[in-house]
Amino acid sequence: MSLKRDFISRVQKELKQVQSLRPHGIEVTLPSDSLQLWEAVVPGPEDSLYKGGRFKVQVYVPENYPLEPPTVRFLPPIYHINVSPSTGHVCLGFLTGENWLPTRCISDVLSGVFALLIKPEPENAADQTLLNMFHNNKLLYEAKARSSAQNRQDDLTAYI
């Protein structure tokens, strides 16, 4: 598969920028020679249920990026209404086809994931069961989310 020169140039520039700026303390690496697959470690925000956790996120950049949005997954999935419990796929409003803007960059995507840990988007829920708990038994939902973050303080190395 041959990637277009514009794609390569843009993605290399964005990678360099994210690695030097480290928005929100997010660390980014490429697990292989492919510019299409990024791995990031996202710290749990201090003012969130995920405080203290460190979460591995995989970003897949499609060939026609920036016309098409990247896809994002938590590996392993985290306990969050916007994350599929089975695949880790992140449901973030501005990553949907109709809301995606080609002027956005991968740094925006990672910042959006970080912000999602602070403020979930119920309108973009990935799982109906979690959404019901979020609305009907918020204390239990919050306890499970906190617990999942605590469990992720030490075991991140198993996934990197």
Locate each region found by the language model:
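UBC/E2-like fold recognition across ubiquitin and ubiquitin-like conjugation systems
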Residues: 1-160
